[in-house]
Regions:
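Outer-membrane beta-barrel "beta-signal"
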Residues: 251-263
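Membrane-embedded beta-strands of outer-membrane beta-barrel proteins
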Residues: 53, 90, 136-138, 173-175, ...
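Surface-exposed loop and membrane-interface regions of Gram-negative outer-membrane beta-barrel proteins
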Residues: 67-127, 205
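Short glycine/proline- and aromatic-enriched beta-strand/turn motifs that initiate or cap beta-hairpins
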Residues: 22-71
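Transmembrane beta-strands of outer-membrane beta-barrel pores
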Residues: 35-41, 70-74, 116-124, 154-160, ...
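N-terminal signal peptide c-region/cleavage motif recognized by signal peptidases
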Residues: 16-19
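Short loop/turn motifs that connect adjacent beta-strands in outer-membrane beta-barrel proteins
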Residues: 22-29, 61-65, 96-113, 142-151, ...
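Outer-membrane beta-barrel transmembrane domain signature
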Residues: 155-226, 236-237, 261-263
Length: 263
């Protein structure tokens, strides 16, 4: 039962999303599938082949973001993850202005939210447990000129591995910026996860993960931003909260080619 729990959790989340949508709580939603091939990864094997499913939606109570990354290690394997791994985050945010029918905007802040996230790493190796992290804190929607969106969340991290103490703080900005180019556009989007302090055996870390993609849609008769291709850069200092040393390198500089289809 424990082995099936992560998949049951994800299935329940997706089914619940569409059930609520039928009740007209949903304002809009977007789903996408991305395929990536990259090199330069640390801690895990150097080469990653990745399929990513993403869901973003806006509701009468707030918003929701979900992604599922499935990795293959090009024939190699890790001690804990085997030949592949799955990592997912489910991040609902609850809008205080929507829930209280109060305008909380000020300056560049459009809305104030209660931000939460449930992070799960699924191990493909006997004898290793799946790992969970729970995050909660204040979130903000920002109105910054030129950006399609810009969010800023502050999280208190609560690990659920039985060994790591709570007490680490994480700052997470997410953004998207579109620039017209060659009768189409270039999309610059991404996020930063910055765990600002150490706790127990866990180091601080800094994860910068932007994508630059060219929108192919207008050239194929598709709606804007349906199909895009480009490059993802992945800089991760002290990856997995493991401090980089001369004997075990955890500072990562990886680059991947990406093709993304949105539906």
């Amino acid at each position: 039962m424990k082995k099936n729990a992560p998949y049951l959790f994800l299935s329940t989340c997706l089914i619940s999303t569409y059930s609520f949508a039928e009740e007209s709580w949903l304002n809009w939603q977007s789903n996408s599938i991305s395929a990536l091939y990259g090199k330069g990864f640390e801690v895990e094997p150097d080469t990653h082949e990745t399929i990513t499913f993403e869901h973003a939606s806006n509701w009468k109570w707030g918003d929701l973001y979900l992604f599922v990354d499935t990795y293959w290690f090009d024939g190699e394997k890790t001690a804990s993850q085997g030949h592949n791994a799955v990592y997912t985050e489910l991040a609902p945010r609850f809008s205080i202005s929507k829930l209280t029918n109060t305008n909380l905007s000020f300056g560049p802040v459009k809305d104030v939210l209660i931000a939460t996230s449930f992070d799960l790493s699924i191990q493909d190796k006997a004898g290793y447990d799946d790992t969970w992290n729970y995050l909660v804190g204040p979130g903000f929607d920002l109105d910054i000129k030129g950006f399609d969106y810009f969010t800023l969340n502050f999280y208190y991290r609560i690990p659920d591995d039985g060994n790591t103490p709570s007490g680490q703080w994480q700052i997470t900005p997410c953004w998207s910026y579109t620039v017209p180019f060659l009768k189409s556009s270039i999309i610059f989007d991404g996020y930063i996860d910055w765990v600002v302090n150490s706790k127990g055996n866990n180091s601080s870390d800094f994860h910068f993960n932007p994508q630059i993609k060219y929108d192919l849609s207008p050239h194929l008769g598709l709606s804007p931003k349906k199909l895009a291709a480009g490059i993802e850069y992945d800089y991760w200092k002290n990856k997995f909260l493991i401090e980089d040393t001369p004997y075990f390198k955890t500072n990562q500089n990886a680059t991947s080619f990406i093709v993304k289809y949105t539906f």
